[in-house]
């Protein structure tokens, strides 16, 4: 069974001075502003790379939780940050890398298990699979 999720974007104006809004069908994002200044100049609002990072961090955390459960483990906490790199490449811009930074507290997990299972989650996460970028993982087992 396929799952279909929807999001929409509205844009007005040219690239540098225009403004857009992003919404999701769940309403979690409702006309959230985005634009050139937020993307390239640190202005207010969100940007596509930040949203991809949030989606990737969330997807990875859920995938890791599932993989831990399959291995008979349960995390007390999983904290994931995604650093998304946008680079200028031939003919424009591309997301060239995503660095996932994981800190997790997992009672009973060995360092070897943690490394194996977190890498399995990195490879198996649906958002990882859709990105054509180098994805690295910095993982810390805490507690």
What are these regions (language model features)?
Residues 1-54, 61-143:
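Extended beta-strand/beta-hairpin segments
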